Amino acid sequence: MAALAPLPPLPAQFKSIQHHLRTAQEHDKRDPVVAYYCRLYAMQTGMKIDSKTPECRKFLSKLMDQLEALKKQLGDNEAITQEIVGCAHLENYALKMFLYADNEDRAGRFHKNMIKSFYTASLLIDVITVFGELTDENVKHRKYARWKATYIHNCLKNGETPQAGPVGIEEDNDIEENEDAGAASLPTQPTQPSSSSTYDPSNMPSGNYTGIQIPPGAHAPANTPAEVPHSTGVASNTIQPTPQTIPAIDPALFNTISQGDVRLTPEDFARAQKYCKYAGSALQYEDVSTAVQNLQKALKLLTTGRE
């Protein structure tokens, strides 16, 4: 992909979107679709913050140029031309990143890549809001991932051993206060995962981070973070795919397929199409479990008129 024209210095008013823009830069080559929507989120958020002062107008204008250039380069990519596909792409990507970090956390493997993955997952869930309101599940994952990143970072920075797995989340105000301090020191370059709890903030690199590895075939969390399947096995620098559990087919679905008297609204067809798109996106990641779940939702909706 051709290099994009650089942006001018970030105005102080846009501090809240600096990490989303960094994530966009990190994904320009790895996943241009993710990079595009990160910039779109930054653009929309920046417009709401300040679109009138000269420095902000100049910055937003250059950011718009980047968006137009990216859209032209991506051409007829369905994840750009169809919102349903784009939303599914981002959700799957963010949840897989969350799952990788959560599995490392549950196994007690605390390292910079895991912290970065938690925080980046939370940023990408922010980005999903360009498609509309977040689901309750995404809101929970975002809160948990952002808090975990800050909690583990602070523990390692202070020479403490973090508690593995789900722990009591602090009050929202505490999360907000610690978020910027923790995020500012997150790694921005690939580092080798380590099973050691030792951590030296002074060794944190400053280049662009591109090394988060997402395990193929891992399935996204089904419910809340506390219900993500536990990771097992010894600490290792090699990320192992999570074994997939294909959900059982609801027998009741087969009894309704032949009835043919269900009255479906245009909204029902749109939701069914959305579930099928989600399933297709999940299969791109070899995520059979999520694909089956979404296909079952579509089938139930089309045969019963209910979700």
From Swiss-Prot:
It comes from Homo sapiens. The modification N-acetylalanine is found at A2. Belongs to the VTA1 family. Residues 198-307 are annotated as: Interaction with VPS4B. It is found in: Cytoplasm; Endosome membrane. Involved in the endosomal multivesicular bodies (MVB) pathway. MVBs contain intraluminal vesicles (ILVs) that are generated by invagination and scission from the limiting membrane of the endosome and mostly are delivered to lysosomes enabling degradation of membrane proteins, such as stimulated growth factor receptors, lysosomal enzymes and lipids. Thought to be a cofactor of VPS4A/B, which catalyzes disassembles membrane-associated ESCRT-III assemblies. Involved in the sorting and down-regulation of EGFR. Involved in HIV-1 budding. It is a peripheral membrane protein. Residues 2-75 are annotated as: Interaction with CHMP5. Keywords: Acetylation, Cytoplasm, Endosome, Membrane, Protein transport, Transport. GO terms for cellular component: cytosol; endosome membrane; extracellular exosome; intracellular membrane-bounded organelle; multivesicular body; nucleoplasm. Residues 179-233 are annotated as: Disordered. Its main location: cytoplasm. Interacts with VPS4B. Interacts with CHMP1B. Interacts with CHMP2A; the interaction probably involves the open conformation of (polymerized) CHMP2A. Interacts with CHMP3. Interacts with CHMP5; the interaction involves soluble CHMP5. Interacts with IST1. This is Vacuolar protein sorting-associated protein VTA1 homolog. Residues 181-206 have a biased composition (Low complexity). GO terms for biological process: ESCRT III complex disassembly; late endosome to vacuole transport via multivesicular body sorting pathway; macroautophagy; multivesicular body assembly; multivesicular body sorting pathway; protein transport. Residues 2-186 are annotated as: Interaction with IST1.
